[in-house]
Every structure is written in structure tokens, then in C-alpha cells.
């Protein structure tokens, strides 16, 4: 995780990346555990990934659903610009992840030269069911919130009436989990 916590139920991803880390032991990947087929049930991914003592069934389900979407690397010297990091990622994927049916995917990265082009790509992302886009400047990686990486999202406000609630699950039991709204 980004806080250094080990996930116990992503062995299928670890196994796929093991040859890469054998050759590049100091490489740090930036990405997220995701599956676009579960875009409306992100809690499913979270519940699978956070299991501390996964059963064989949990491992099997995670292997069929949880993917690593890889979008950047953190280099040792932190002096490589984003466009060069992207090229390196594509080289690594070609060398180490040669078959497309594996749980490690490179996130599509496209250069844009104008707000209109960024808007067109963003609109295509929304039409594809994604929640937004990320705009990265061609700068070195910063391990913090940065102007060099901006979310591009559309927002809409709606009014709703709270008609109920659902109790939290697991360690959140006994607390408010979510509201039911109309």
C-alpha cells in the first residue's frame, strides 16, 4: 500500500512481478489495484485485498478479479521526466509482462497539447465508465500531492433525502457504514 502495509491477498500479482523485481530490486511502482469490470463495486476489490488471512477461495477470487493498473515508477535518483518513465514502463511490460491476460496492466497515457485535446480524452474516459482523468506534467516524480499531477473530474451536485442507513462492517461494525438516500 502507499503507507507500506503489505496486502496478503495479491500473491497472483506478486508472482507476475517477481521476475521484474529480481532484475530491478529497488524499483518502486505507482499504480492501483483495480478492475474496470468492478467500477461500480470498488468495495469488492477493497474487501478482497485487505483480507489478512485469506482462504484458498479468497485467493482464487482475488486472482480472477484484482488487477494492478500500473501508471508510473519512482526512480532512485528521481531525475527522470514523466515521458521517459512512460517509455521505460512500456519497455518493462514488453520484456516482463508479455501476455495480455495477466493481472498487470499499463494505464494508457496520451500526450496532450491543449485543453481541448485533454477535454476530448477526458470525455472518452467518462463515456468508457471511468470517473475522470489524470493530467501529469512532464516533470520528475514527486512523492507527495503535486501540481505536476492533477485530477480532471466533472462534478455535479444533487439534493437527496436520507431515508435510512446501513451499519458498518468488520472493524466498522457498530458505526455508520453508509446512508440510504432518495
Question: Model-found features: residue ranges?
Answer:
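Nucleic-acid 5′ end/cap handling module spanning
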Residues: 1-4, 58-65, 76, 90, ...
Amino acid at each position: 500500500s502507499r503507507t507500506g502495509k503489505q496486502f496478503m491477498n495479491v500473491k497472483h500479482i506478486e508472482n507476475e512481478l517477481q521476475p521484474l523485481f529480481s532484475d530491478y530490486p529497488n524499483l518502486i511502482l505507482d499504480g492501483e489495484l483495480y478492475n474496470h469490470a468492478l467500477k461500480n463495486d470498488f468495495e469488492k476489490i477493497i474487501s478482497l485485498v485487505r483480507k489478512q488471512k485469506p482462504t484458498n477461495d479468497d485467493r482464487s477470487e482475488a486472482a480472477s478479479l484484482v488487477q494492478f493498473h500500473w501508471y508510473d515508477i519512482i526512480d532512485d535518483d528521481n531525475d527522470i521526466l514523466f515521458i521517459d518513465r512512460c517509455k521505460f514502463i512500456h519497455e518493462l511490460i514488453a520484456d516482463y509482462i508479455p501476455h495480455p491476460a495477466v493481472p498487470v496492466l499499463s494505464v494508457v497515457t496520451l500526450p496532450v497539447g491543449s485543453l481541448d485535446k485533454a477535454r476530448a480524452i477526458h470525455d472518452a474516459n467518462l463515456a468508457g465508465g471511468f470517473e475522470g482523468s489524470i493530467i501529469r506534467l512532464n516533470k520528475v516524480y514527486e512523492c507527495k500531492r503535486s501540481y505536476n499531477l492533477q485530477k480532471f473530474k466533472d462534478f455535479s451536485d444533487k439534493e437527496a433525502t436520507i431515508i435510512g442507513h446501513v451499519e458498518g462492517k468488520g472493524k466498522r461494525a457498530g458505526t455508520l457504514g453508509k446512508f440510504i438516500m432518495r
